[in-house]
């Protein structure tokens, strides 16, 4: 169920649309637009990527409503270890990026991006490995099974990997690859973009489940899925602002078990954010409520045409939400 009352006029009255400049290109963008909802229970973030159509983006709106109108789950831990995130940058930029994640002992490195070669991926991973003891890579489904098997060999020639995140696009490919290689496999898109988020686990196609609050419909929806998964869970952001990061930390703090560092340190990828970014202490963040700074909201406000674009998007997604919930 979607928390209420969250009528469409009420949502739009509480809306702030911001454009956050990024330090480096990530997912092909240099500015991250998100819509924030100032609700009676707190702040929610609707940041479905621009190319997502309403049927997929609606879950992200559900997450924003959940945060703005609902109540957070009980906190089980006050410290969430995080990983550094390294985009597809030249090796020379790696030290500067890692410095934004003080104390992090795990790093996730983007690989298999358009225009990048396996050789450049290996160089980037090795540059990270020289500075951080635990390395995982994220291919965003960019490889075939054969390419992923080849990459697994190349990327582990100079040291181990914690896991390969979404090396191939489909559940069938992940299952086949898992039979062929020894490197653990984590599923991300195969969970958050699937009609059945549990299919990849039932197929024995992953060793780790990467769960993201917004695409799964909110903190409570994520925790419900996590309770049905019998493999370790990693909570990660979807290039969220400080508001979305707070929701991710809330989810991570509520899990019964947390075996791996979480991908919730991505606030360091922004030049400016809507609130003062949380600084990791000894590689960890504490769950806490985030209230955007009014001055930052004004300074980072999106252009009028972009604000209207997000209003139209919410209008398109909202009916899909409540149809799904049975209201």
Curated annotation (Swiss-Prot):
Keyword Zinc-finger assigned: no
Disulfide connectivity for this sequence is: none
Active site per the UniProt annotation:
110 (proton donor), 212 (proton acceptor)
EC number(s) per entry:
4.2.1.113
Q: Name one GO biological process term.
A: menaquinone biosynthetic process
Task: Spell out the reaction equation it catalyses.
Answer: (1R,6R)-6-hydroxy-2-succinyl-cyclohexa-2,4-diene-1-carboxylate = 2-succinylbenzoate + H2O
Going by the record, the broad EC class of this enzyme is: lyase
Gene3D superfamilies listed in its UniProt record: Enolase-like C-terminal domain
Answer whether the UniProt record assigns the keyword Cell division to this protein.
no
Q: Which GO terms describe its molecular function?
A: magnesium ion binding; O-succinylbenzoate synthase activity
Q: Provide the transmembrane region boundaries.
A: none
UniProt keyword terms in alphabetical order: Lyase, Magnesium, Menaquinone biosynthesis, Metal-binding
Q: Which CDD domains match?
A: OSBS
Pfam families attached here? Enolase_like_N (PF18374), MR_MLE_C (PF13378)
Query: Annotated pathway, please?
Result: Quinol/quinone metabolism; 1,4-dihydroxy-2-naphthoate biosynthesis; 1,4-dihydroxy-2-naphthoate from chorismate: step 4/7; Quinol/quinone metabolism; menaquinone biosynthesis
Cofactor(s), names only, from the UniProt record: a divalent metal cation
InterPro entries per record: Enolase-like_C_sf, Enolase_C-like, Mandelate_racemase_C, OSB_synthase_MenC1
Which residues are noted in the entry as Mg(2+)-binding?
Answer: 138, 165, 188
Q: What does this protein do?
A: Converts 2-succinyl-6-hydroxy-2,4-cyclohexadiene-1-carboxylate (SHCHC) to 2-succinylbenzoate (OSB).
Query: Its family?
Result: Belongs to the mandelate racemase/muconate lactonizing enzyme family. MenC type 1 subfamily.
* Protein known as: o-succinylbenzoate synthase
Q: Which organism is it from?
A: Mycobacterium marinum (strain ATCC BAA-535 / M)
